[in-house]
């Protein structure tokens, strides 16, 4: 074994063409395709539901084309009427409630210092994925294309190229106050309880308007950014801000307007930024819209049709094995002192799992949509206002730990450090991640490792700073934190500067993977795979078996290497092969560049191979030559949990 990722995925990587309407494809996206078809059947057959009406309004292209740019008039007139900074802030308050970006982001979550829900304030205000795009030389070509794109779009509003120059110049100034991606991950630095009255002038006024008297305290995630953007909200920049606001109205609503406007916006955000040649089919984009506003209404029907209760029962058993495996490993850690080990076990004991679907569905009473395409933008305003008010209603009340923040039809998994729970929506609990008919080794190597990954986030470089109740305070001794950091530093070094195949073959300039930025996800992956193996051993032991007792069987994964089809594999080997199959993925190089700048996950090929190379059992399962790219010498392998 020289390359686990390609051993399982080589044929698929060589022959599979990424569909023209997406920048990435693989196992996650194949599951999303299936969930999308399932949701389409639900929405199509429920024309009088909220989802059905919203979907129909998006599909009514004749009315949308007739309406042209006019649906934006209420937003644009609001901005045109602004004559002072105070009026600008008032306009931002109204725009924010109806789904338009404003210079400061705000969301409601559990307070990391109490059990209440509280607003968190974050940096915002950019039209590019990250502040690095405005300052790093390797992104200057993209920045120039962005300015040209802003000009193209603002022409739909009758504005000239000078307006685009003003918008991008202001965004450069906004970006200068943004924290970098590594700093924004720091749980301690980004937790700053602040009195509303102590926020800098214009930001205070903005938040007073948005929060409507629900609280006198917020959490400032990036305090210096709030000071910075407040310093830009001045009378001499008023014209710049009004143009900026018009741009963000148009940018945010472009997909709801005529095909010409929608395609023009996609030409940059789809093609330039991600390399995607064509937009997704309209019905798919319509489903995205419906899922975004009434996803749990759809999810209730999705679960009834596509998620048997037996799958939930079996997943609970799998989670139990993973938790027991973590308990065993933590109990045996030689690098952690007994007192800290005990506190880690206390946190693990408080861990909760949400599987499949919520016990209580969201109530959408009061939200109504119209089916006509001429009402599409207004439908989105209504939906945004409903969700805005829904979140605002939580503030200063005990946080509801049972609430789901995703839909059952979402193909993903989540760990929430402020609640200490994981969420596994129904749509991810399908092959190749999970199947009730699959061999246990394959389920542990796929969904088991993903479960282990999510639990592992509770013990990664940031999650480990929260206790079992989701509160942010140090439960580590200095000695233990130093030992932890020593181990994680090796993982940072292993990933630092790695360049994904797509980018290398395209000859695109890049600094590669940022090992510090991706550390949390890499810790999650490392713990996930290692703990999945421990859990699989426990599963076998409960049945009176060991790894040596597992039968050899073929591993079925269409698109593997020729060698994959020639052999049968032990249980441990199939666990690793299932791990590799999960990470099957191809990405356009433009998207890989964007993700390395803004996404804390490493590229899939490295999540598979570098992580597996650190796990001792890989070398028991396969013969890995010392000169193989994925071989890691024993003294350099990282084991944390």
Region locations from a protein language model:
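Intrinsically disordered or highly flexible coil/loop and linker segments, enriched in small
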Residues: 10-14, 45-48, 64, 101, ...
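His/Glu-rich zincin catalytic helix
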Residues: 1-28, 130, 421, 426-428, ...
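Active-site-surrounding "flap" and adjacent substrate/cofactor-binding loops of secreted or lumenal enzymes
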Residues: 1-3, 7-66
């Amino acid at each position: 074994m020289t390359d686990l990722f390609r051993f399982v995925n080589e044929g698929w990587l060589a022959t599979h063409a990424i569909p023209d309407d997406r920048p990435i494809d693989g196992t996650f996206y194949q599951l999303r395709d299936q969930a999308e078809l399932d949701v389409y059947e639900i929405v199509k057959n429920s024309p009088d539901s909220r989802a059905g009406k919203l979907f129909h309004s998006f599909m009514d292209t004749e009315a949308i084309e007739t309406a042209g740019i006019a649906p934006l008039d209420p937003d644009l007139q609001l901005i045109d009427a602004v004559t002072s900074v105070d009026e600008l802030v008032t306009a931002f308050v109204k725009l924010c409630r109806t789904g338009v970006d404003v210079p400061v982001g705000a969301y409601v979550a559990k307070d990391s210092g109490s059990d209440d829900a509280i607003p968190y304030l974050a940096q915002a205000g950019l039209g590019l994925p990250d502040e690095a795009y405005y300052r790093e030389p390797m992104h200057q070509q993209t920045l120039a294309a962005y300015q040209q794109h802003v000009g193209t779009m603002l022409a739909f509003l009758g504005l000239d190229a000078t307006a685009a120059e003003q918008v991008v110049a202001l965004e450069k100034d906004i970006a200068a106050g943004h924290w970098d991606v590594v700093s924004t991950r720091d749980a301690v630095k980004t937790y700053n309880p602040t009195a509303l009255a102590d926020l800098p002038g214009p930001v205070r006024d903005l938040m007073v308007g948005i929060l409507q008297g629900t609280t006198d305290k917020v959490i400032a995630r990036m305090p210096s950014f709030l000071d910075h953007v407040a310093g830009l909200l001045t009378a001499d920049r008023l014209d710049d801000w009004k143009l900026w606001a018009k741009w963000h109205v148009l940018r945010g609503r472009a997909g709801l307007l005529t095909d010409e406007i929608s395609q023009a916006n996609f030409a940059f955000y789809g093609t330039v930024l991600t390399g995607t040649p064509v937009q997704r089919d309209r019905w798919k984009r319509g489903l995205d819209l419906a899922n975004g506003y009434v996803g749990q209404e759809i999810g209730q029907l999705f679960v009834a049709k596509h998620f048997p209760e037996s799958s939930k029962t079996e997943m609970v058993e799998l989670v139990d094995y993973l938790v027991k495996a973590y308990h065993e490993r933590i109990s045996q850690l030689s690098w952690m002192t007994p007192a800290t080990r005990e506190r880690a076990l206390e946190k693990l004991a408080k861990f909760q799992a949400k599987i499949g679907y919520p016990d209580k569905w969201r109530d959408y009473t009061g939200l109504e949509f119209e089916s006509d395409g001429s009402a599409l933008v207004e439908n989105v305003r209504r939906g945004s206002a409903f969700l805005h008010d829904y979140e605002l209603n939580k503030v200063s009340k005990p946080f509801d730990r049972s609430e789901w923040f995703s839909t059952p039809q979402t193909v993903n998994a989540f760990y929430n450090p402020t609640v200490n729970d994981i969420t596994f929506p129904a749509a991810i609990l399908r092959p190749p991640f999970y199947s009730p008919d699959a061999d246990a080794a394959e389920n542990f190597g796929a969904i088991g490792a993903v479960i282990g990954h999510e639990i592992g986030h509770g013990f990664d470089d940031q999650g480990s700073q929260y206790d079992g109740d989701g509160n942010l305070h140090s439960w580590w001794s200095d000695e233990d934190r130093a030992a932890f950091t020593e181990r994680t530093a090796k993982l940072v070094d292993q990933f630092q500067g790695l360049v994904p195949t797509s980018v290398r073959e395209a000859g695109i300039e890049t600094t590669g993977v940022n090992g510090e930025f991706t550390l949390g996800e890499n810790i999650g992956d490392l713990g996930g795979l290692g703990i999945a193996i421990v859990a699989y051993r426990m599963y076998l032991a409960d049945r009176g078996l060991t790894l040596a007792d597992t039968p050899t069987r073929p591993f079925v994964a269409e698109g593997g290497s020729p060698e994959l089809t020639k052999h049968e594999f032990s249980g441990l080997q199939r666990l690793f092969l299932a791990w590799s199959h999960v990470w099957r993925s191809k990405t356009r190089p433009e998207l890989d560049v964007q993700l390395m700048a803004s996404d804390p996950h490493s590229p899939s090929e490295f999540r598979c191979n570098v992580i597996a190379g650190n796990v001792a059992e890989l070398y028991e399962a396969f013969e890995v030559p010392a000169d193989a790219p994925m071989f890691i010498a024993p003294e350099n392998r990282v084991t944390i949990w």
